[in-house]
Design a protein with these regions (language model features):
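A short hydrophobic beta-strand element
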Residues: 72-82
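Short, low-complexity N-terminal intrinsically disordered segments enriched in polar/charged residues
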Residues: 1-25, 29, 127-131
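Short, cysteine-centered beta-strand-loop-beta hairpins and adjacent loop/turn segments enriched
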Residues: 56-60, 84-93
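Low-complexity, intrinsically disordered terminal/linker segments enriched in charged
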Residues: 111-131
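A solvent-exposed, acidic/Ser-Thr-rich amphipathic alpha-helical stretch
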Residues: 5, 20-72
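Hydrophobic/aromatic beta-strand elements that line small-molecule binding cavities or substrate pockets
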Residues: 51, 64-70, 83, 95-101, ...
Length: 131
């Protein structure tokens, strides 16, 4: 079971932009990640490689400070907001909820939930998402 401080350390690392390092530091070797009801990706090395591959396609990934997260025993829920800037400078936003199952002080399973119809909406100059 993770302590609240351990979860906060994970959140801090992601918000600071250290996405791949966060996987290295906070996930079990046999961890899984799953997008909605898609096929889970398995294994820390694969998760790190996939994350790096996604980041390499972007100019920038900005993680908004987390306003809401819950810790209940081995279960953690996080409301994430991400802005990605592509190579052409277009900014898009994703809001999602991540449900994690921790084993000890590391993440064993993570599943992301978001609306695929509105995911990655373009962020206008005024900061609002255009759908």
């Amino acid at each position: 079971m993770p302590s609240r401080e351990r979860v906060e350390a994970f959140l801090k690392e992601v918000v600071e932009g250290s996405h791949v390092t966060a996987i290295a530091d906070f996930y079990h070797d046999d961890a899984t990640m799953q997008e909605n009801l898609g096929v889970p990706r398995r294994g820390k090395e694969m998760l790190m490689a996939r994350e790096q591959s996604v980041l390499d396609q972007l100019q920038k990934m900005h993680t908004h400070p987390v306003q809401t997260f819950l810790v209940d025993g081995d279960n953690v829920a996080i409301r994430w907001t991400f802005d990605k800037t592509d190579k052409d400078g277009v900014v898009q936003r994703l809001e999602e909820v991540a449900l994690q199952q921790w084993r000890g002080d590391r993440i064993a399973k993570e599943q992301f939930f978001y609306d695929t119809a509105t995911a990655w909406g373009v962020v206008g100059p005024d900061g609002t998402v255009q759908r």
